[in-house]
Structures are given as C-alpha cells and as structure tokens.
Amino acid sequence: PTTCMPDLNGPSMICRQRSLCWREGTIEERMQHALIKGIDKYITEDTEEARQHYDRCLQIIEGPLMSGMQVVGDLFGEGKMFLPQVVKSARVMKKAVAYLEPFMEEEKREAGLEGASQRGTFLIATVKGDVHDIGKNIVGVVLQCNNYKVVDLGVMVDCDTILEEAVKHNADMIGLSGLITPSLDEMVYVAREMQRLDFKIPLLIGGATTSAKHTAVKIAPTYENTVVHVNDASRSVGVVESLISDDLRDNFVTENAKKHAQLVSSYRERTQKLVPYEEAFAKRFSTDWESVTIDEPDFLGSKVLDDFPLATLREFIDWSPYFMTWELKGKYPKIFDDAVVGEVAKEVYAKANEMLDRIIDEKLIQARAVYGFFPAASDGDDILVYSDDERSQVQTRFHCLRQQWERRGQKDFRSLADYVAPVDSGRKDYIGGFVVTAGIGADELANQFKRELDDESAIVVQAVADRCAEAFAECLHQRARREWQYGQSETFSNEDLISEKYRGIRPAAGYPACPDHTEKRTLFDLLKAEKTTGVELTSSFAMTPAASVSGLYFAHPEARYFAVDRVTRDQIESYAQRKGWSVAEVERWLSPNLAYEPDNSAPDNSAPDNSAAAPTGSCPKCNCGS
C-alpha cells in the first residue's frame, strides 16, 4: 500500500497526478504524503480521521503534521524541494491546523492544556513608506513551515509599531523588509531605536534594495546586538535556526561579525576614483544638436488609459523575473529544460497562467495608465518642462544627477539631461512621462486568498500583477515610441523588446540613472497621476498599489541606461541648490549614493515635510519591484 509514498530523494509529483494508491497507507503516511506533495484535497477528512485515533488534537500537530513538515524542511534545505512546493505544503498544514483549532480550544477549556509548542517567535514587517511584501510573505510561509510562530505586521509599518509589537509578542528576533532605497534609512533608524531602547534580540535585514555591505557598514554599527543580512527565503530558515539554537548561536554570531568586519574593511579601502563635479560636467555626453534628428510627438499633454485590457498585456510579459520570485534560477523559456528545476518551473508557470486567465475572465484586477509628451529643454543638469510649445513659461523641472565615477575607458560622464536639447541650442525637443498600474484590486484579491489559508495563490496574484505592470510599461513604451514618430516602423518581437533593442529609454526615479525617489513627485504632479490612475505615493515615495511603474521617456538616438553611482559633496550642494532643499535633506534621500560621510551633527530644520506626499520597486528601467 505504500508503493507511492513520498520519494524523499526528490520533488517528483508524478504520483500525485497519476495514482491514488497513496490513499491506501496509514493515516500518518497519508498526512505526510499530502504535506510533502502539497495535496490539500483530502486533508480535512484525514485530519478528522486522525482526531478519532489520537487522544488530543495537539498530538496530531506535534506528531504526523510536524513530522511531515520536518521532512519538507529537510528536503528544502538539501535542495531537493523548491520554494513553490514548500508554499503548497504550508497550505496543507494551515488547513489541517485550522480544522483542529476549534477542537483544541475545547480541549484546553476542559483540561487547562497548553497549546502546541513552537521553536520561537519571528516578527517581520515591511518598513514605513514601503509597500512591497512578496518576499516578506514568502519568508513568513517558509518559517511557519519550520514550526516558528510568525507575526507579520504587513507593509508601511512605522518603527514604534514594530518595536511595540515585538515586546507584546515577546519576539525572539525582528525581520525588516524593503524594496526602495529610502527604506534603507528607515532600517538604520529602527536599529538605532532598538539600541536606544536596550533590545537584546537579533535584527534580520532583507529585500531587493538591501545588501550585505550596506547592512555591515550602515546598519550593524548602530545596534550592538546581532544584525544579519538575509539574501533570500531559502537562507532565512538556516539563519533563524542558528540564532535560536544554543549550540549554533555563538559560532554563527562570531562568523557574522567577521563577515561584517571584512565588508567594512573592503568598503573603507575601496579605490573608486571620482572626478570633481565641475570636471564631470565639462566632460558630459555631447550631441551635435544642429544635425541630430528630433522627432515631434503626435500630441502634447497627457492621455489616460482606463481599464486597459490585461489580455493585451499578456504578450508583453517577461516571465524570467517571475521564476526569480520563486527562487527558481533560469531564463524563460529555457528554464523548462533545466534538469533540476524544469518540472517545477512548468508547474509554476501553469499556475500563473491559470490565475491570469481567472483574473482576466472575472475582471478581478484593473490596469490603468496616464502618459504624455511635453516641450522640454535641458538647463545644465536640469530638464525644463514648458507649459506649451511656445516655450514662454516653465511648468516644472526635473533635477538630474551626473556620473562622477571614472571608469576605465570612459569617454564621458552622463546625466539624463544630456539627452534633451539645451535651452540655447535653438532646437525644439520633448520629454515623455508615464505612470501605469496593474494592481487595482490585486491586494484585495491576495488578502482574500490569505483568509482562505491559500498563501500560494496570494503570492501568485501579487507576482502576476507585478509582471503585468512591467508588461504594461513595455506595451505603453512601444505605443509612445510610435506616437513620438521615431518608432513607427518597429517590428520587434517580445524577446526583442525584453532585450531593449529599440531606440529610446524609460528610466525610473529611484533607480541607477536617477536615484532620487523624490523626483516622482514632479512626475505625478505633471501627469495628475493620483487623480487619473489611483496610484499614490507613500511618505518614502513608494507607489501604491505596489504593482505600478513610472518613469520618463527619452527619444535621443544614443540614449542608454547608466548608473550615477556615488557622488561627491560638490554635486550634492549643486543639486540641493537647484531643488531648493537643504544639503542635509538631499543627503538623507541620496544616502546610498554619497561618496562621503555627511555631517549629521546639526539638526536640519529647513527640510521639506515629505508627509505631504502621502495623498498622492527591481529593474533599472522601471519601478515595478521586479
């Protein structure tokens, strides 16, 4: 009867698809098989059968259920089971426990019994101003699978709430997540507050914008207890286990401190050569503005696309980042042929498309956009946007930063302003802008699945919405190039679009070519994006819904993406003067890009109140959080 019990040497799902002979096993074997294979169809009836065989419900949880999840954890740790399968297993476990909970409550009332023991309490949150939580949610599921109590505070959680809840739940450690660069400063602030309030528990740092170097150099020095950077969900289990275990903790903490010391030493000894800002500007990217072709857009001003069909966006989806969400390495579609993850990738892809079919058929999520073209001219490292093509009145201006890092063989130091004709060139030039979202309704749908104990579908919804948002940005950029005349003869395939073989770029505020997230405020005001799309900016200038993308369009024939990287104080002073901000405020928003240590001794009383942004994610060309 056990011929189709789980194959502990690998994650094959053939048995689940082709045979039910595993149903002939003992109740313990059936429950273990269901957990390992992620089959929830029979778990309720099996759990009830187990309840008839065991004296207490707690024995079921601590017996066959935890035994099955232990196998799941072991296989995951050995690389024989993958994240999508672990999430399926978690769904089975949650359904079994949910069925037992009312019976357990009754047992506790009758006998004063204790609940199931857990290995520790892990509190996790996406920090203030940040709305991205796919990675955080995955970490929570994985830790729950390993019998840790997870207190998930959600997104945009302020420091006070995080620390108050940590005390309330007697947390054994705190995990902070974030995608946008301003979240890094918020993490530093939380660490400082933990030090001030004499916390003694480890602090874990994760998210796309974080790094081991930033954690070691900026966060760890502010908190005398253990601070660990966690790369991904699969590593989180080992880190938490090492910090919880009396046998493993001391050695892990020592090795972590050594890594931090090495990273700090490497950071201080870096040899990156930066030229003065004045020299970088003198060696800027140049264009023969007399001869270059400048195309005029079909229209000036903005257009709104409401309830854009998701079916149209499907053909523009780049699926490779979707597999990265599930920690499956490989590019689409070659990943399907991978000997290790190919079969799992096929299942993940099928699930995503099933969800997308349902979203489209039932109209569960809406896509909206606003985009436009405007008369523009560069003025030094600023881009002026005019009210109309008479160009007599400046409507707004975008502030740009310039490269100062002198790389080998480098001929120029670029700024986005270089791609727009200067005021004194005698040429009429233009700039475009856009805000798109494919997330209207996505959070509500994901939360519905969470209430149904279906973490897998909740994560799929969020990840698919992110892919659709990026696809919308790609689709709209194609449309914009055609309406700007220069892209009318394009015949690119989706693979060509993903490879960016077309002319023109669409850089996003907060990413390498324009690292200042606050420039989104200018774009949103120009396009009236809150009113037209429903997309808003948080206090840290993250976009909500999270499945949103925004940026500028540049049509220059030689425009390409680049990284500003680190900048010196002389450029920061110029930038602050142009924005009308204090140097200290600019330093705060651009702290990851500073090539020097700012003077934080004096309070900054002249900084703008960024809470006013509230009423209003990653690849370098967008802000989708991918």
PLM feature spans:
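Long, charged amphipathic helices and adjacent flexible linkers at domain junctions
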Residues: 1-33, 83-125
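Phosphate/diphosphate-binding loops
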Residues: 182-205, 209-210, 217, 221, ...
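Amphipathic alpha-helical packing elements
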Residues: 71-76, 194-216, 300-335, 567, ...
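Cofactor-cradling patches in redox/metallo enzymes
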Residues: 136-146, 151-220
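Active-site loops and adjacent core secondary-structure elements that bind or stabilize anionic groups
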Residues: 1-73, 234-459, 463, 484-486
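Flexible, glycine/charged-enriched surface loops at secondary-structure junctions
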Residues: 42-46, 53-64, 77-86, 103-116, ...
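C-terminal accessory domains/tails appended to large, multi-domain proteins
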Residues: 413-600, 615-625
